[in-house]
């Protein structure tokens, strides 16, 4: 995490100019965190179906480039009216996995290049991946990766859970005097 900006810099990805307009469906804590973490050059439209929650979003979303819309993010007419065809990214972050999957499919069909679906029902992850709806996030899998990282008590830089393959991949930082330095992987 402390080298993320450095890596972005040397990779030429300090910013993501290809993503400037983002639609977020759902007004839960994940949506709030995402909207508040966006850089200034990104504009977000958060669509929330619950009126009271939409009002609350106006208080907790501090990003001045975020607009709160009270409506149904599955309503294609609303999406068209709000300019979905000009969006480069669509994040479906409701508490309903099925809704998120279908919304991302609709966004893809409307021309959005990058879609993210929060899929909390682990039974749907494989199906969602096969539909090619974009990136799939699962809080349980994400949390499990971090718990696993803490349990190992090693100098691990990254742990990823591959839900479809039922596997974990860990990236370790190896000290310069370790026995495995300068050896072939096969050894």
Regions found by a protein language model. Name each.
Residues 1-187:
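Cytosolic regulatory regions of ion transport systems
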